[in-house]
Amino acid sequence: MSIVIIGSGQAGFEAAVSLRSHGFSGTITLVGDEPGVPYQRPPLSKAYLHSDPDRESLALRPAQYFDDHRITLTCGKPVVRIDRDAQRVELIDATAIEYDHLILATGARNRLLPVPGANLPGVHYLRTAGEAESLTSSMASCSSLVVIGAGFIGLEVAAAARKKGLDVTVVEAMDRPMARALSSVMSGYFSTAHTEHGVHMRLSTGVKTINAADGRAAGVTTNSGDVIHADAVVVGIGVVPNIELAALTGLPVDNGIVVDEYLRTPDENISAIGDCAAYPIPGKAGLVRLESVQNAVDQARCLAAQLTGTSTHYRSVPWFWSEQYESKLQMAGLTAGADTHVVRGSVDSGVFSIFCFLGTRLLGVESVNKPRDHMAARKILATEMPLTPEQAADTDFDLKLAIARHKDTHKDEVASADIGERQVVAS
């Protein structure tokens, strides 16, 4: 049996590794757009910006690993066509590779800013190692920076730039940072944190143009006509899923490649995982597409188990993290639609959690410097343990003890949830 994986990011890499760890003995071909071995992306906006770039430190495995595990790594040669009838993919150099099963792990790409000046030298995006190296070099030679977009990437870049002593202005179209992902309380905490560290936060502000001087980016003009001068500009306004290959071959797409709870497309010989996959979540209307290492890894492991004989649907509690200054933000669950937000701890102390409810149902938890709350939240969400807003607010209420008691009184249900988690979390 031959398995071809399109995309050598976290999801594609993990699929290849997990297939071997599950005993798959057939042919594995991992095809990636970028040159070199698969590498980690999260450090690019974190530790990588704080030190001299060392691409080797990002590698998920050294090149020899792929030879040792009989994984054919095809780098820097994008797939341009999928022939579903012939079950083969065609690369940009006209090479054809046949498959018995195809895994689409095509990921996502930067959303481009559609304004004049967006293509000027000195305008940076941040998703690849090459882009991180370019940004790091630029930050070393400039004294001021404008960051367009107050999402996770934008704010992590802003924090790194402030630590390097740059004057930083963040321009965000919405009225609060990380608004699509976080509660208003948590957004407010990070807005204050950045302001206290010297970042100029320009919220509810759009960008009209990126300005030029001597042929390079020199700042921006806002929609209200304000001119903000800077030596470089970083654009972090989200990503777009890479769904074109799937769409061209007739697979359904809907802000992602549409898959079922088993990560299968309507073509039984093609699956999709990671940032490019739109999949159903029980109890949530429509499809969800998540951009996280956890989702990429867990989906890859779940699919590898299926392809080697263990039939199981994908279920895993989503979790995310971000590091900004002294604050480590950890999120569990999906909190969109929450109508009640309960603070556990003290926001002013910088050590607290926000439990997000819809009625009496816990949707998710946002934690700052409280890893125990984060781990408890993942267990509560995985086992659907009842928790009231009053209990969440009470710091004397022992979450760990409540989880243990729930486990003892619901052994069969918890065991089933634990098995599902292990199937997607354990390597």
From Swiss-Prot:
Its EC number is 1.18.1.-. It is an enzyme of class 1 (oxidoreductase). Its cofactor is FAD. SUPFAM superfamilies: FAD/NAD(P)-binding domain, FAD/NAD-linked reductases, dimerisation (C-terminal) domain. NAD(+) binds at residues 144-172. Keywords: FAD, Flavoprotein, NAD, Oxidoreductase. FAD binds at residues 2-34. GO terms for molecular function: oxidoreductase activity, acting on NAD(P)H. Pfam families: Pyr_redox_2, Reductase_C. One of its GO terms (cellular component) is cytoplasm. Belongs to the FAD-dependent oxidoreductase family. The degradation of the thiocarbamate herbicide EPTC by cytochrome CYP116 (thcB) requires the participation of a flavoprotein, rhodocoxin reductase, and an iron-sulfur protein, rhodocoxin, to mediate the transfer of electrons from NADH to P450 for oxygen activation. This is Rhodocoxin reductase. The gene is thcD.
